[in-house]
């Protein structure tokens, strides 16, 4: 609605209007009506223009405020379609701005250690992918040199155990010791058996040191010396008998031990098979002898029954047959070559024997 800025009733009456009060004039009335209509039209048009200008000013002020926030001026001669597109773009820009603000807030809240840990990952993502270097295939590495040394102990104190030997050598400063091997002593058949004593004694042994130098020094210093220690010790007066084995390794010792063990097992196997065969032959002979004895007994019983019923001649024949049956095996004796039976001059041989004996005694 347009508002009237001018009040007609408060206007000063002109001279023409003053004359109209006196009498009615049709022409003057028509002219006055036309003037009023013109005035009304001009007022309405002016009001409309003022309203449009105020609306345009408001829209321009809003656009200017938006452009100040965004930093992008807009022209006044844009169509409604462009304004809609601009609104959509403004909303998208606002969304991006919000995302950027959120990202900045998130990075601000992170601790410096976390940011450092995440920085290489982000840089790796943004940076270009680097080419992987081709690693050469693992070549066959040469085996490490075996710098160990081995000493041989030809005799050991009685009932000395491997860990006791190792501790004795290490307490004297000869170490580190990597391996110890002692061969158990095999009791002889003539020696008396001791069932009560369960402790083992060892005949000889080998000790491997981590370095050759310590093995040489140990063999040179301790060889042909007493074990020592406390005076009341069990091994105080025993003597060390050791030698450094030059160019000898633990693998060689194991090969030798395995070879001896395999030979021992093979000999034992052969002896076992031989003993089994002998036992089998003996059992077969015993069984055959029992069978023959049973047959002989049955035959004798039959002959006795026949002899009782028959004549005396029959009994004599049965006795002769029984004597023949008893002689089952005959061993043929081999004659000795050049025996006394075939020597012609026994007296000459006796003379020669006497002469030799007289020279000796």
From Swiss-Prot:
Biased composition (Low complexity): 111-129
Keyword Nucleus: yes
UniProt GO molecular function: RNA binding
Annotated region (Disordered), positions in chain: 1-145, 293-320
Gene Ontology cellular-component terms listed: nucleolus
Gene that this sequence comes from: esf2
Protein name: Pre-rRNA-processing protein esf2
Keyword Nucleus carried by entry: yes
